Amino acid sequence: MRNGEVTTINGAWNEESNAWVSEIWCLTGDCWLEITLPDKGRLVIKKAETLDGPWPKAKITTWTGPEFRIRIYGSTKYRYVRIYLTEEPVRIQFANTKGYAVRSL
């Protein structure tokens, strides 16, 4: 994989957490995760964590419509984040400093 690319995302509904759980792996640089929901309902991120525990630096920016952006800062250890959402997304897109990759669930 080339420098700056974003790897695939995994996601599934987790009954124990009562949340949609997604794992994001970003190889290098700052990364953004954009989430689109099935309707214009409110997205709630129940928690975000890294391999070392809670990730308090998750910055959420609301866009127009049902889209949300989460920035994964370059200081995030291992460039890995697991997020817990209150709704299952219909689309997840990635952007980073080296390009754009799209994954559909």
Regions of interest found by a model, annotated:
Residues 1-26, 55-58, 93-105:
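Glycan-recognition and processing domains
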Residues 10, 36, 61, 71-73, ...:
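Residues marking helix boundaries in flexible regions
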Residues 20-31, 37, 70-76:
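Extracellular and analogous surface-interaction loops
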Residues 24, 48-49, 86-87:
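Secondary-structure transition/turn motif
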Residues 30-32, 73-90:
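Noncatalytic modules at the cell exterior or secretory-pathway interfaces
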Residues 37-43, 86-89:
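Short proline/glycine-enriched turn/loop motifs at strand-loop junctions of beta-rich domains
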Residues 40-54:
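Short, surface-exposed beta-strand/strand-loop-strand elements in extracellular ectodomains
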Residues 55-77:
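Extracellular carbohydrate recognition and processing domains
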